[in-house]
Amino acid sequence: METQRNYPSLWRWGTLILGMLLICSAAQNLWVTVYYGVPVWKEAKTTLFCASDAKAYETEKHNVWATHACVPTDPNPQEMVMENVTESFNMWENNMVEQMHTDIISLWDQSLKPCVKLTPLCVTLNCTNVRNNTSNSTSSMEAGGELTNCSFNVTTVLRDKQQKVHALFYRLDVVPIDNNSTQYRLINCNTSVITQACPKVSFEPIPIHYCAPAGFAILKCNNKTFNGTGLCTNVSTVQCTHGIRPVVSTQLLLNGSLAEEQIIIRTKNISDNTKNIIVQLKTPVNITCTRPNNNTRTSIHLGPGRAFYATGDIIGDIRQAHCNISRTDWNKTLHQVVTQLGIHLNNRTISFKPNSGGDMEVRTHSFNCRGEFFYCNTSGLFNSSWEMHTNYTSNDTKGNENITLPCRIKQIVNMWQRVGRAMYAPPIQGNIMCVSNITGLILTIDEGNASAENYTFRPGGGDMRDNWRSELYKYKVVKIEPLGIAPTKTRRRVVEREKRAVGMGASFLGFLGAAGSTMGAASITLTVQARQLLSGIVQQQSNLLRAIQARQHMLQLTVWGIKQLQARVLAVERYLRDQQLLGIWGCSGKLICTTNVPWNSSWSNKSQSEIWDNMTWMEWDKQISNYTEEIYRLLEVSQTQQEKNEQDLLALDKWASLWTWFDISHWLWYIKIFIMIVGGLIGLRIIFAVLSIVNRVRQGYSPLSFQTLVPNPRGPDRPEGTEEGGGEQDRDRSVRLVNGFLPVVWDDLRSLSLFSYRLLRDLLLIVVRTVELLGRRGREALKYLWNLLQYWGQELKNSAIDLLNTTAIAVAEGTDGIIVIVQRAWRAILHIPRRIRQGFERSLL
């Protein structure tokens, strides 16, 4: 009985404990939460566009780099340093280099398209040496000077007429025909189509800033001793690179950027003779190049609208072009280069020798000076041997203050080492001089034994990618991934309609500054981080339209214009993709969006504190990147189900407020309902009248009018008031029907209302009695089940007790028997000596 009294309390406490366990287990559930504007990026290849301050340069000439089509440079460039971020860079696998190389070639070709083709000049040239006024020249051209005077026939304005003209050509631009000493042709006539550069085209390098479109960013390594490959610990993000001058040169890098602390050696493999070595200097070396000849330029008409520009005459003596470099500065720089090379080569002997041969562009230091293409012999620069920790020794015994490099000039240039394309550079009038800074070297190492004590380096080049690589080594392009997914304890509870705001994008400069912070710290600043993507797209479009408007007379878009259009389309596509995903997930206009998708521990089983307090968004993204598509799919399925539920819920939205019933827009509907009710009542009145008439006709009455009296019941206590007054009183009396339309309607409404009331009351009473009966029966059934459960519980308990008692008794009886047997055996063992003694005693007796 005591146990029976404790059953209700046990059930009560058990239910309470079970509920608490369910609540606690539900509280530990994690749900997927979407974050927009997180500092996450991935390496990408994208179309970059250019920015340039073209107004600061001469505007009369058309620059070959077409920087007028670039957007203006930002007067306040932003650079956001990312704390606690380590990023991997690889200058040898940088798509920015390939893109710049392709752009420069395309710009070069595009600038030559409208220029004059020099096919009519592929004729026989009768050439003689040009003599100085003060000295005699040799009789043969091979031994003569750099210039030769050639006469040839060209077609005039009239195609059937020819005239003989003459012009000065450089020796490098003509070759003899059949080893004839007087008859020559232009060097490229048998291999290339020669195009003359337009007279007003300038080759002056203008700094070009490469910029990333909206949705992308450029990461910059700020380590002062960074060698171009590996991890960088000082990383910042920029929108555009620094101004890069597209200087086309070989062997020596001109007017580039300098190293900050020490000379930097950059190479893919320093012992591989097929790989170029890029040396970035710390201190620039001045180089001054001069063409001392005072040339005049003449124009030769090749036909209608076509003119060929050539050197007409030279005023004064013919002197060779040359470049001057300070010997002291060069030797000091070379000593620093040797020191850094010795670190990579274990302090062995290092020698510098001239280039071993090849194309003239590679064999010499080639560059453009004021429109003339110079090819300078650098044997005077690279002819020395260096011992580690010893003084400098050189084969050059000259003690001149400057090193003079003899230079030759070519007008027919085969740019980019491509077959089939050549350019004729028109001569420049007057003296030419250009002052540049040597900021880097391109070297190659001779093939040899790795155990050799002497390493030989030679100047190299020819692949312009190395020129661009020397400036772009510290940059890489990344794609911003502003959508982040992480587990939280918050779940989307309510289903309600959202007022969807206009979504804002992520600022790749602002929010990447929080890249090194933990996820919890970075998520606090999402509002600041997600504001400038769309505005960046609009600003880029504005800049592009401004540039096109300024050059609207040019119907042909430049390479830069096309790239800007591509960049903008790409940015818009990325923005729309992110907004589409947010819309599909029901997160439009939200920076932090909770969802109804439970977090699966197989994606990540880390705790909340491990995720939000110890991990960055980049680390977290790498961990769950394999499950991103699956999570996206679940978010879409969840939102689809929620929208379906929302649609069902909104079907009842019209009942949300009773005041909407009085909206004037509903009045026509109310009038329609009133007319339908009145029409129905009239129809019912007619039907009832017809049925009443038919019923009375069947009973023998003949209705004369609608005023026929109908029986009206009255009480038995009311006697007949007049006339006959005797006999048995009738139970009914007749009353007249009402007169008029409104009384008829009112009477019918009253009768219909009373009938409906009585019918509904009867139905309600039936329902109440049924529910009461069901409730009583249900309560009795539950009570019976409870009693039955108690009875069987008690029976089970009694059976268990009986079983336990029986088991205990059986065990006790068995144990007692075993104990008795053990005792008897033990006593028998104890009595053995006594029995033996008694046996001996009996035997003795």
From Swiss-Prot:
Intervals of motif YXXL motif: 701-704
Stretches the record annotates as Fusion peptide: 501-521
UniProt keyword terms in alphabetical order: AIDS, Apoptosis, Clathrin-mediated endocytosis of virus by host, Cleavage on pair of basic residues, Coiled coil, Disulfide bond, Fusion of virus membrane with host endosomal membrane, Fusion of virus membrane with host membrane, Glycoprotein, Host cell membrane, Host endosome, Host membrane, Host-virus interaction, Lipoprotein, Membrane, Palmitate, Signal, Transmembrane, Transmembrane helix, Viral attachment to host cell, Viral envelope protein, Viral immunoevasion, Viral penetration into host cytoplasm, Virion, Virus endocytosis by host, Virus entry into host cell
Extracellular side: 29-673
Annotated GO biological process: clathrin-dependent endocytosis of virus by host cell; fusion of virus membrane with host endosome membrane; fusion of virus membrane with host plasma membrane; positive regulation of plasma membrane raft polarization; positive regulation of receptor clustering; viral protein processing; virion attachment to host cell
Ranges where the record places region MPER: 651-672
Gene3D superfamilies given in the database record: 1.10.287.210, Human immunodeficiency virus 1, Gp160, envelope glycoprotein, Single helix bin
Coiled coil: 622-656
TM stretches of this protein: 674-694
Stretches in topological domain Cytoplasmic: 695-845
Region Disordered, annotated ranges: 708-731
One Pfam family here: GP120
Family according to the record: Belongs to the HIV-1 env protein family.
Name this polypeptide is given: Envelope glycoprotein gp160
Species for this entry: Human immunodeficiency virus type 1 group M subtype H (isolate 90CF056) (HIV-1)
